[in-house]
Amino acid sequence: MTDYVTDIAVIGAGPVGIFTVFQAGMLKMRCCVIDALSEIGGQCLALYPEKPIYDIPGYPVINGKELIDSLKKQSEPFNPQYLLGQVAEKIEDYSDYFLIRTTTGIVVQSKVIIIAAGAGAFGPNRLPIDNILDYENKSVFYQVRKVSDFCDKNIMIAGGGDSAADWAVELSKVAKQLYVVHRRKNFRCAPNTALQMDNLSQSGKIKIIVPYQVKKLCGENGKLHSVIVKNITNHEEMALQVDYLFPFFGTSANLGPILNWGMEVKNYQILVNAETCLTNRNRIYAVGDIATYPGKLKLILTGFSEAAMACHHIYHVIYPNSPLNFQYSTSKGIPENC
């Protein structure tokens, strides 16, 4: 029994997956989008909704939530079907269509598959502390959903990469006290961000605690009141008053069932033809961060371009006897009866 029938099944509802809906719609192809998360947006919305993005054409700066909202609005005329909280588990190839089965038993029939799953399913790298689960989503968070929620609070950021440094700069604007704890004296972040952190440290807006690491969380009922940190050189410990802790140690990605679909994979990325984004499997494409080829740039705008290339190639697969006369969107507008 088939629950949904579509032209293209898009695996992943991040920015590139949503833009794929628009590109397909401009060619009068319907999309059904499958994503494991409970809302569209992928990592862009789940991890960085208020983090500024500077390399989207036409936007001097835009945050993750604003970008996803704009992409969603842009794709709405094409009435995509979103299947959220669903993992595409198995695919069955019937020569001219696929059946895609999700972990909850939903079956989607699709002529073509486009994988736009970013880094795949992902989760945070946790601190090795026994009781950290007691505090997660209460006073320990792995993303900043809304900066204003942390106004006038004592905040600790643990980590030394770009995410830790970027959010230290952003949260210093609203925090009562902000600690940045790192096991090394040097931060692995953009030079300009490192300079900003240094200036904020000198002005007292940020207290940089190095070379230390988080040792213990203290509180009750999931609410922190202090964090004990330990010097990794002389083993000295100190307790710092903390309301919220943000461990920024990156995420662990897992392609999950996609690894079993027969595509060529290298370093957890799917190898594709650079001109069409076609994988080694007929009628299965990959775009965005999950796709790779010589010279690939892992940028959102690169994924947008790949979505357009894939959809134009797919048109000839779905409509082999119907020529595609290329037109700019300014000429043809939004197709009707999509």
From Swiss-Prot:
It catalyses: 2 reduced [2Fe-2S]-[ferredoxin] + NADP(+) + H(+) = 2 oxidized [2Fe-2S]-[ferredoxin] + NADPH. Its cofactor is FAD. Disulfide bonds: none annotated. Its EC number is 1.18.1.2. FAD binds at D35, Q43, Y48, A88, F122, D289, T330. Binds 1 FAD per subunit. GO terms for molecular function: ferredoxin-NADP+ reductase activity; flavin adenine dinucleotide binding; NADP binding. InterPro entries: FAD/NAD-bd_sf, FAD/NAD-binding_dom, Fd--NADP_Rdtase_type_2, Ferredoxin-NADP_redctase_2. Belongs to the ferredoxin--NADP reductase type 2 family. This is Ferredoxin--NADP reductase.
